[in-house]
UniProtKB/Swiss-Prot annotation:
GO terms for cellular component: host cell cytoplasm; virion component. It is found in: Virion; Host cytoplasm. One of its GO terms (molecular function) is protein serine kinase activity. Keywords: ATP-binding, Early protein, Host cytoplasm, Host-virus interaction, Kinase, Magnesium, Nucleotide-binding, Phosphoprotein, Serine/threonine-protein kinase, Transferase, Viral release from host cell, Virion. This is B1 kinase.
Length: 300
């Protein structure tokens, strides 16, 4: 359905005039609105993923909470957007859910493609640190992102040095009342996320915990450097079991993974991925140590 021209009424009774379609993904379509600072994200209510996003926005992404966390951690920027409003729209046969969220600029995937599918190591390390800061905030609220990738990382409209991790349709609550979720498989959750970057735990049906997001970020950084992961081509065939088995083969062979993907082994990624692979499912990572490792790649 094309929503352009429709007037949507949100939960606060404000009205939004839907403009042209500017993006479409696995978790909804994105349209401009009559306010250039915001976009509206729409999908059928029955799909459920936008409700997951709405819940995450309202429970976790409160500006006051983010600001307080930044001050307490001495971190200048947390790349998470907030939700202006939400609501429901009913057509003749289908009911839709919509969110009104901040409008951003181009995504990192477009930037990488414009640079011949390769970014300088310094840029990759800086992006890695930004995403690490962002997922640390999420993790300390008890949530994992579950779908880190270049197309879900978006530049600010004005300040191109600010990045935002978007699309919260696969967020998972791995902590509740101070208790970590148990290490139990759910066959319905197997292979969630983007196959090329899905963490091994998710392939097996476990809830993505902190180590899963860090694992995915490692795969992404290899790709951003221009590497081709050993399972990249397999991912295109949607052979989930073979992708999972191939990833598992490299868990204790980080140097081989890097040499196969990049034809060289950047010291920072070797240390980063090795440290990620040493984490247990329940373990809280030493984010400062991960930041320190990536920062070495910024200056050397």
């Amino acid at each position: 359905m094309n929503f352009q021209g429709l007037v949507l009424t949100d939960n606060c009774k404000n009205q939004w005039v839907v403009g042209p379609l500017i993006g479409k993904g696995g978790f909804g379509s994105i349209y401009t609105t009559n306010d250039n600072n915001y976009v509206v994200k729409i999908e059928p209510k029955a799909n459920g993923s936008l409700f997951t996003e709405q819940a995450f926005y309202t429970r976790v992404l409160k500006p006051s909470v983010i600001e307080e966390w930044k001050k307490s951690h001495n971190i200048k920027h947390v790349g998470l957007i907030t939700c202006k409003a939400f609501g429901l729209y009913k057509s003749i046969n289908v009911e839709y859910r919509f969110l009104v969220i901040n409008r951003l600029g181009v995504d990192l995937d477009a930037v990488i493609r414009a640079n011949n599918n390769r970014l300088p190591k310094r840029s990759v390390m800086l992006i890695g640190i930004e995403i690490l800061n962002t997922i640390q905030f999420m993790h300390e609220q008890g949530y994992s992102h579950g779908d880190i990738k270049a197309s879900n990382i978006v530049l600010d409209q004005i300040d191109k040095n600010k990045l935002y991790l978007v699309d919260y349709g696969l967020v998972s609550k791995f902590m509740s009342n101070g208790e970590h979720v148990p290490f139990i498989r759910n066959p319905n959750k197997m292979d969630n996320g983007t196959l090329e970057f899905t963490p091994i735990d998710s392939h097996k049906g476990y809830v993505v915990s902190r180590r899963g997001d860090l694992e995915t970020l490692g795969y992404c950084m290899i790709r951003w450097l221009g590497g081709i992961l050993p399972w990249t081509k397999i991912s295109e065939t949607k052979n989930c079991a073979l992708v999972s088995a191939t990833k598992q083969k490299y868990v204790n062979n980080t140097a081989t993974l890097l040499m196969t993907s990049l034809q060289y082994a950047p010291r920072e990624l070797l240390q980063y991925i090795t440290m990620v692979n040493s984490l247990t499912y329940f373990e809280e990572p030493n984010y400062d140590e991960f930041r320190h490792i990536l920062m070495q790649g910024v200056y050397y």
